[in-house]
Amino acid sequence: DQSQDLIDALHRGDLDILLLALPFPAESVETMTLFRDPFLLGAPPDHPLSQRKALKTSDLRGQDLLLLEDGHCLREHALEACKLRESEVVTPYQATSLSTVVQMVASGIGVTLLPEMAVKAGVVPAKEVAVTPFQGGDVSREIGLMWRRKTPRQTEFRLLGDFIVGHQTSM
C-alpha cells in the first residue's frame, strides 16, 4: 500500500499504528523516529558503479535510475536523500513495486536505490544485483511510528518504539 492509503486507514480507525518512512505529511498524528535506513545502490554486477567499494551521490547523475512511480514515498525519499532533482536523473521506466524494480535492474535496464532494510529482508537476488553503499552514511531515510494524536494508547506506542530502538541492532 502507498503511505497515503495507510494514513487514511489510520485516520478512519482501521489501523492503530503505522511503521513507515518519515517524514510524511499528515494531520492529527504523532510520530516517533526509530532509526535511519541507509540507501544502497542496486546495479547489475557488471555495471561500472558495481565495481566500486562506495559511491557518491553525484555518481548517479546521467544514470538510468529505476524508481517507483510518482506517489510512492520511497521515490521521493530516495531522491531527497541523494539530494537529486527529477531533472538531474534519467528515469526511463517506473514500477509499482520494489520487487519489479529489482527485476528490472537484474535484467540490465538500469540502476536503483534500495533501502538497506529491504536488502536485509532478501528482496535482492545476490547473484543478479550487486549492492554498493554510499560514502558518508548520510544517504538514508528515517523510519518511525505514527499514530492518531488522540489515541488512549500513546503510552503503549511509545513503549513499543522504545523497544524497537533498544533492539534494532538485532533486527
Annotate each language-model stretch with its function.
Residues V129-M171:
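A late-sequence structural motif
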Residues L22-P23, P45, E116-A118, I143, ...:
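Short secondary-structure boundary segments
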Residues K83-P92, E128:
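A local structural motif
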